[in-house]
């Protein structure tokens, strides 16, 4: 009997790897077919494989199918890990269902579940999307009290959303607090902030963050450079302010004046 369980475990592991590979390769239907076959064996799929399938469905935009699977998991008594809840909350938020993500989170919080920083970051983003700005800020402020530490992704989520909502000074304060805490911004975070500020017309602030990119020996992403060219070109809305750009980016001058 022991050898049978061992063989079954190996078979399940192989199937999990295959399903994950199918999803990553964009072969969603093949992954779902294999999952259904796996569901028919004696040992039912565990939490990990359910999380993989849910994640794959959400990333492919099959939100309805993901929701149906989630409700079926509840009916079947499948045990949920915090990681699985993170997949569901993130999937809902990224697929136009941020309101549902926030409602689900409120229900989970009422169950006194302990969330990790990834889950809190996801729900903070969802709260911003549904206009619960103050609640998102309070959630962020309460992170240390929960024994957790904000990551670069958490800070990026806060700063980018605050800028999007026009709260640029608050975003600057969050960025400063991040640096004081010893958490260093990465290139992606700085590029996101720069693009958000440029789109909001906060030229001086954007340039300030561009100098930080210089000081940290990082580079602007292609999408950031493209935005700079479109905004500061002859026909761009900020053409008259092109001289404010740091010297390092004067290589754009030919494109800007064309």
Predicted regions and their residues:
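Eukaryotic acidic, Ser/Thr-rich intrinsically disordered low-complexity regions
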Residues: 221-258
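Pentatricopeptide repeat
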Residues: 11-16, 20, 31, 46-51, ...
């Amino acid at each position: 009997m022991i050898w049978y369980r061992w063989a079954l475990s190996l078979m399940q592991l192989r199937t999990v790897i295959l399903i994950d590979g199918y999803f990553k390769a964009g072969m969603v239907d093949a992954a779902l077919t294999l999952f259904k076959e796996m569901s028919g064996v004696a040992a039912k799929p565990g939490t990990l494989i359910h999380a993989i399938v849910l994640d794959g469905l959400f990333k492919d935009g099959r939100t309805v199918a993901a929701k149906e699977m989630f409700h079926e998991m509840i009916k079947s008594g499948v045990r949920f890990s915090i990681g699985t809840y993170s997949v569901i909350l993130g999937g809902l938020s990224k697929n136009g269902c941020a309101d549902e993500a926030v409602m689900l989170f409120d229900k989970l919080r009422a169950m006194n579940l302990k969330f990790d920083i990834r889950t809190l970051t996801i729900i903070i983003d969802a709260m911003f999307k549904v206009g619960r700005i103050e609640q998102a800020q309070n959630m962020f402020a309460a992170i240390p009290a929960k024994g957790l530490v904000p990551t670069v992704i958490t800070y990026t989520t806060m700063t980018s959303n605050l800028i999007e909502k026009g709260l640029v000074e608050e975003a600057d304060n969050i960025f400063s607090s991040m640096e004081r805490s010893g958490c260093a911004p990465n290139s992606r975070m700085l590029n996101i902030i720069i693009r958000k500020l440029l789109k909001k017309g906060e030229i001086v602030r954007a340039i300030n963050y561009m100098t930080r990119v210089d000081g940290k020996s990082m580079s602007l992403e292609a999408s950031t450079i493209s935005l700079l060219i479109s905004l500061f070109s002859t026909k761009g809305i900020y053409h008259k302010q092109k001289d404010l750009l740091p010297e390092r980016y004067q290589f754009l001058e030919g494109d800007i004046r064309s």
